[in-house]
Amino acid sequence: MVMVLSESLSTRGADSIACGTFSRELHTPKKMSQGPTLFSCGIMENDRWRDLDRKCPLQIDQPSTSIWECLPEKDSSLWHREAVTACAVTSLIKDLSISDHNGNPSAPPSKRQCRSLSFSDEMSSCRTSWRPLGSKVWTPVEKRRCYSGGSVQRYSNGFSTMQRSSSFSLPSRANVLSSPCDQAGLHHRFGGQPCQGVPGSAPCGQAGDTWSPDLHPVGGGRLDLQRSLSCSHEQFSFVEYCPPSANSTPASTPELARRSSGLSRSRSQPCVLNDKKVGVKRRRPEEVQEQRPSLDLAKMAQNCQTFSSLSCLSAGTEDCGPQSPFARHVSNTRAWTALLSASGPGGRTPAGTPVPEPLPPSFDDHLACQEDLSCEESDSCALDEDCGRRAEPAAAWRDRGAPGNSLCSLDGELDIEQIEKN
């Protein structure tokens, strides 16, 4: 509608059109919408409309006079000829302004317009930022930067900023704090050590989520915040910042009173990953390794004694009747040789059965001597019964030493190397 009027006015010429034809229709239009996305020139406040003739592409033939000065009062019927095209455009724009005439901000811009960076370079001169006046929800933020991890960046001049997932960041061209009282209030908000070079300023420190830049005063006690500072989870603006009292401490003053915005702390920041650790696996409890069964020598010796008692035919010979010591020893040696031949290289014994050890040489000599003595006694005393009676106690006395020198007892000691080999 605006473009049609401007083209028609430019083709016909401003001189040929009567002034009274547009006065009633253009001066009392109905407000079409309060939405913020009507003009691609950007959203502007009332005080910004004076720069419309310089910035926006809607140019007039004589742009020297500002558009608002050529608007007449509603009572006067005479209009300036030069202002006909200006009135056609500006009356619509003035009624479609988003902010009220009292200065109170209306609805904020849409989410797409806030986040979009699709303005071209040609329209960058026309674009101005939408800044509400003293709003509790909308704070002036130029760019939302996300510094995850909370790294402290130190610069060459000693200027340090703690930059973490910033829900608030001061713009690069921030408002200059003009008085030392504001400095004192700003530094007292974050508590800690007193800043250097600021007279009468409350202490400021760096702890946890707070930031404490080394702010150097520039001529006349002014602080120049040229770099963008960020304060995590804090939402405040310099427009309505009121410094707390001098004796207020974080313990005495409640949290909502100390916050300038009066809003609760936002816990839904997407980049704050300090509370939960991502990608950390829980360690499983270490499995207790079961100990391998060790060799129980006492039990093995007991099994060996029972095996020897079963294999030896001493009990059977006693039940059958009196035998000569020669026959008794021969039966013992035959039983052991049969066991050794069975467990030789041809066949293997079961794993649980103890293996009898080979006869020691001393025991072999003892058996040989015993056999020789028994043979001599049997030859010399074959017909004499008394000689046989004397040989029996001697054989019984000799047999008493045999259990002590038996194969499996060996004073309770086993040859472990022989067991492992078998």
Curated annotation (Swiss-Prot):
UniProt-listed PANTHER family: PROTEIN FAM53A-LIKE ISOFORM X1, PROTEIN FAM53B
Tissue: Detected in skeletal muscle, kidney, spleen, thyroid, testis, ovary, small intestine, colon and peripheral blood.
UniProt-annotated location(s): Nucleus
Record field: compositional bias (Low complexity): 245-268
Organism: Homo sapiens (Human)
InterPro entries (alphabetical): FAM53
One of the record's GO cellular component terms: nucleus
Location of region: Disordered: 245-269
Summary of subunit composition and partner proteins: Interacts with CTNNB1.
Protein name: Protein FAM53B
Keyword line: Nucleus, Phosphoprotein, Wnt signaling pathway
Similarity-based family: Belongs to the FAM53 family.
Functional summary from the UniProt entry: Acts as a regulator of Wnt signaling pathway by regulating beta-catenin (CTNNB1) nuclear localization.
Residue numbers carrying Phosphoserine: S118, S167, S169, S179, S212, S268
Pfam families tied to this protein: FAM53
